[in-house]
């Protein structure tokens, strides 16, 4: 079973993902960047984070990704952008995050298919 953390500022989507039998959603939808690190400190065996650029926090995105990867180098990250942002996409790709989707172009069913296709070393 894939352990998934959501930090998408969308509690409804988090609840819908919890209904999927193949996933274990860890906690509630995270509402700020630093909470991601707090949860990973307690539970580092999470397989996948679904992360949105909308998540507020003091830590810069690049530093957050760096810290996530230090805590769990095998973790996969799906990143949801609000709109096309080439500068942010370049930062994500530089940090080996290639699963980048746009909020207005992805729905729950598509997200579930993407998660099911993700190769996760368990």
Indicate residue ranges for each PLM-predicted region.
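A short, well-structured beta->alpha microelement
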Residues: 8-10, 17-44
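Alpha4 helix (beta4-alpha4-beta5 surface) of REC/receiver domains from two-component response regulators
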Residues: 84-99
């Amino acid at each position: 079973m894939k352990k998934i953390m959501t930090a998408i500022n969308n509690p409804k989507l988090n609840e819908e993902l919890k209904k999927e039998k193949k996933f274990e959603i860890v906690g509630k939808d995270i509402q700020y960047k630093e909470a991601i690190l707090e949860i990973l400190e307690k539970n580092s065996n999470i397989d996948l984070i679904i992360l949105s650029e909308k998540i507020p926090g003091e830590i810069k995105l690049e530093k957050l990704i760096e810290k996530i990867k230090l805590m769990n180098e095998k973790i996969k990250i799906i990143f949801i952008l609000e709109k096309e942002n080439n500068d942010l996409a370049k930062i994500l790709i530089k940090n080996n995050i290639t699963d980048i989707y746009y909020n207005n172009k992805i729905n729950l069913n598509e997200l579930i298919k993407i998660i099911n296709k993700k190769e996760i070393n368990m």
